[in-house]
From Swiss-Prot:
<dbReference type="InterPro" id="IPR022091">
    <property type="entry name" value="TMF_TATA-bd"/>
</dbReference>
<keyword id="KW-0963">Cytoplasm</keyword>
<feature type="coiled-coil region">
    <location>
        <begin position="53"/>
        <end position="264"/>
    </location>
</feature>
<dbReference type="GO" id="GO:0005737">
    <property type="term" value="C:cytoplasm"/>
</dbReference>
<keyword id="KW-0333">Golgi apparatus</keyword>
<comment type="similarity">
    <text>Belongs to the SGM1 family.</text>
</comment>
<dbReference type="GO" id="GO:0005829">
    <property type="term" value="C:cytosol"/>
</dbReference>
<dbReference type="InterPro" id="IPR022092">
    <property type="entry name" value="TMF_DNA-bd"/>
</dbReference>
<dbReference type="InterPro" id="IPR052602">
    <property type="entry name" value="Growth_transcription_reg"/>
</dbReference>
<keyword id="KW-0175">Coiled coil</keyword>
<dbReference type="Pfam" id="PF12325">
    <property type="entry name" value="TMF_TATA_bd"/>
</dbReference>
<protein>
    <recommendedName>
        <fullName>Protein sgm1</fullName>
    </recommendedName>
</protein>
<dbReference type="GO" id="GO:0005794">
    <property type="term" value="C:Golgi apparatus"/>
</dbReference>
<dbReference type="Pfam" id="PF12329">
    <property type="entry name" value="TMF_DNA_bd"/>
</dbReference>
<feature type="coiled-coil region">
    <location>
        <begin position="439"/>
        <end position="535"/>
    </location>
</feature>
<dbReference type="GO" id="GO:0006891">
    <property type="term" value="P:intra-Golgi vesicle-mediated transport"/>
</dbReference>
Length: 547
């Protein structure tokens, strides 16, 4: 009974072990432990195998001894039965029975001793069986641990598979990103080269623009200096114009006062002969005799006047006509704003009062060699400039300095023929000509000022455009440097991604190596488990066959 009990317990333990092993084998669950844990488990399994073999041997020996004892016990029982049968025989066999009893007592004592020894051995076997049960419990614990480890392994395997797939996907993404980054790096290199070329071109343009700006600045400075000189000259000319204007106003006022006084006093007509006086006032006296009208018939004329010859009268009439034409030419020029009578329009003027005024007026007249077109052109351009002083001077100079007509030139030729070398006033003429500024110089100065101002304006516009282009070029250079920095950062990122890819490839290779090692270890464990199962099955079969 006890042997059958222990056999059932061992069968149950072996069935539990087999079920755990079947779970491990069928589920392809491979424990993933460190090398130290695997080595300790291998040692425990080997120790259990050796102990199981020793226990199986001891169990076989004990079974054999039990069988022998049972056989001997059955023989002893048969002998006792025989003795009991012999006791029922007659008393003749008493002596033989006594001997047999003594032998049986002796055998009984031997059997009792043997039974005590067997009981001791049985107790030892029970202790050993208890130890085996403890070891079987250890085996059960180990099987449970194997199950937990197998579940952990399955979980870790699934996690590892997911991580492996994730790493493969990351590697694929990194490869794609690396390819894209390589393509982007090539594009960035091309863009960088183009940006560098643009920067070099812009730098060259900037240098040329700076040189052009320097040249324009020099031209502007030179034009400003020339403009300052022109302004100084213009100021001096304006001062001269003011002086001339004051002189002209003073002369006009004197002439007006003289004319008004002469008109009120009604002076007598003065007629001279064709002779030339010896003093320097001949010119004025001659001009006074030119205006001969029908006032000769006036009863106020003195009777002792010298008659004029016919040749002289014809000559005087021609001169009078030329003189009228000359003053008609002067009339539209508007010498002053107030209407004034011509100084030679009166028939009778006192010689003593108007001599100085006429001399000054004639001294201020220009020479016949000056061109009328030059003076009129300078006056019109001066009026276009809008400068008050220049326009005022132009109006005065066009009135005073306008060239004479053909009649006036004839009159001047007549005067040159009639005047003696000693009767003229060259000092006054030279003085009047020196006070009048050159209008052609004013015209040149005005045109030069306008041209320089236009050039200054265009130069300022060009400088502003050049500054804008310079700022744009600087901004493009800054953008190019920023793009270059971005390209450098992207290159660094590509290098980092390349290093990460290499590290991941190394980790993948190492994981593949460890996976191969683990798979080999699992294959070895599967073989060991199969051997253990076969061994346990053989032991169970042996125990079952002996029972």
């Amino acid at each position: 009974m006890e042997n059958s009990k222990w056999g059932g317990f061992l069968k149950k333990a072996m069935s539990n072990v087999e079920t755990s092993i079947d779970k491990v084998l069928d589920g392809n669950q491979i424990e993933e432990m460190s090398r130290g844990n695997a080595k300790s488990k291998d040692e425990i399994i080997a120790k259990l195998l050796t102990e199981g073999q020793a226990l199986s041997k001891n169990e076989l020996k004990l079974n054999n001894t039990i069988k022998q004892l049972k056989k001997s016990l059955s023989e002893a029982e048969t002998k006792l039965k025989r003795l009991d049968e012999k006791q029922a025989t007659p008393e003749l066999q008493v002596s033989d029975s006594k001997e047999m009893e003594e032998q049986l007592e002796l055998q009984k004592s031997q059997f009792e001793k043997r039974i005590s020894i067997l009981e001791k051995e049985k107790e030892d076997l029970q202790r050993k069986m208890e130890e085996l049960t403890v070891e079987s419990m250890e085996v059960v614990r180990l099987t449970r641990q194997v199950e937990t480890l197998s579940t952990q392994y399955s979980i870790q395997r699934s996690q590892w598979v997911r991580e492996d797939e994730k790493k493969k996907k990351e590697i694929q993404d990194l490869k794609e990103l690396y390819e894209k980054s390589e393509h982007g790096a090539k594009n960035w290199e091309r863009e960088r080269e183009t940006f560098q070329n643009q920067v070099s071109q812009m730098s060259k343009q900037l240098d040329s623009l700076e040189k052009l700006c320097e040249r324009k600045d020099e031209e502007i400075r030179s034009s400003q200096a020339f403009n300052m000189t022109l302004r100084e000259e213009n100021d001096t000319l304006a001062a001269q114009n003011l002086d001339l204007q004051t002189q002209l106003d003073r002369l006009q006022r004197e002439l007006d006062t003289n004319i008004r006084s002469n008109v009120k006093s009604k002076p007598k007509k003065i007629v001279t002969t064709g002779g030339i006086p010896e003093n320097n006032d001949y010119t004025v006296g001659k001009v006074d005799t030119l205006k001969v009208t029908k006032e000769d018939e006036d009863p106020t004329t003195p009777t002792n006047a010298i008659p004029i010859p016919s040749s002289m009268s014809k000559r005087d009439e021609a001169l009078e006509n030329d003189k009228d034409n000359y003053f008609d030419d002067l009339h539209p020029l508007n010498i002053s704003t107030s209407p004034q009578p011509s100084p030679l329009s009166f028939s009778e003027i006192p010689q003593s009062d108007t001599r100085n005024a006429l001399e000054n007026f004639l001294d201020n007249l220009p020479s016949p060699s000056e061109e009328r077109s030059r003076i009129s052109r300078s006056a019109s351009e001066a009026r276009k400039l809008g400068i008050n002083a220049q326009s005022r001077y132009a109006s005065i100079s066009s009135a005073v300095l306008s060239p004479p007509s053909e009649a006036s030139r004839k009159f001047s030729l007549y005067e040159s023929e009639a005047i003696s070398p000693t009767s003229g006033t060259p000092s006054n003429l030279e003085k009047g000509a020196g006070n009048v500024p050159d209008v052609s110089l004013l015209e040149q100065l005005a045109t030069t000022i306008r041209r320089l101002e236009a050039e200054l304006q265009t130069t300022k516009q060009q400088v502003a455009q050049l500054i804008i282009q310079r700022d744009q070029a600087r901004q493009e250079i800054v953008d190019a440097y920023v793009n270059n920095d971005a390209n450098e950062d992207s290159k660094k990122q590509v290098e980092e991604l390349r290093l990460q890819l290499q590290n991941l490839e190394k980790e993948h290779a190492s994981t593949l190596v460890t996976l191969k090692q683990k798979s080999d270890k699992v294959f070895e464990l599967e073989l060991d488990i199969k051997d253990m199962r076969e061994l346990y099955v053989s032991q169970i079969d042996i125990l079952a066959g002996r029972q």
